[in-house]
Amino acid sequence: MAGFLQRLFGRQKDLTEEAASPPVSETDIDTQPLPARRAPFPAATEASPDHLEPPQLVVGMGQSAGKQRDHNEDALFSLTTTLVSDTSQIPFGLYMVADGMGGHKHGEMASGIAVRAMASHVIRELYAPLFSLPSETPEQSLQEIMQAGVQNAHHTILTQTPGGGTTMTAVLILGDQLTIAHVGDSRAYAIRSDGSMQVLTRDHSLVKRLEELGQITHEEAAVHPQRNVLYRALGQGEAFDAEISTSSLPRPGYLLICSDGLWGVISESQILKIISEASSPDVACQKMVAAANEAGGPDNITAILVRLPD
């Protein structure tokens, strides 16, 4: 098992360092809560054959079209499971948020295609071999599998819905390792037990790039009229590499994956307050979506919150 995982994980990249130093650079009627998903989620630890009680990973989801949109172009995906043997327990989680663009039909189709194409690739290349009997070693590392999944999604959108585009933030948990594939301006955050909140992805927007270059301030970027214009999105332009980051799981704490309809409307302090006071990730997601709607709900809103074990 050790050799299997060593080959699979490949070279680790410290996501915390990269995110810290970017390049120069209960519910209202408008909220559509998604059912909570609860599954065994242990760290990759040794287990006693006589007493195996893995801790729980709890996942909550929430989504809304918002107050000013008559349709929803966001898509999400969530899968949580655990590989358990008589001596070890390895958690597996795959979570994705995609924010479509290109109009009602094209945007909705692009985001849906993206999550299905990415999920099917990861399940086929990683999940199925990992959980087969006997276990098979995938031919690629986690980073290579995630990169190939993004390319698969990109080409599928170009083929099936020309003119459509979407962001994609895909988070993969395997054992104690976190791998993120990212394109666009949806985001992944680490929320730690000390109350700190860290962005784990970089927005691929023109305004964010101007901020990285020092041409505008963070405050100016937040209200810039072109802040939602992207220079990188799935289904748009030639093939490109997604940003792939790998690190150890930031636990105990939470992972939040969300579209800009959430992070661009309510503040980080509001997000932290809601999560700290909520009784579960599902309730937290419903309350975050409701808060974004109460703030005007200018865009589609999607959130996935994963509570990590101690």
What does each model-found stretch correspond to?
Residues 1-310:
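PP2C/PPM-type serine/threonine phosphatase catalytic domain
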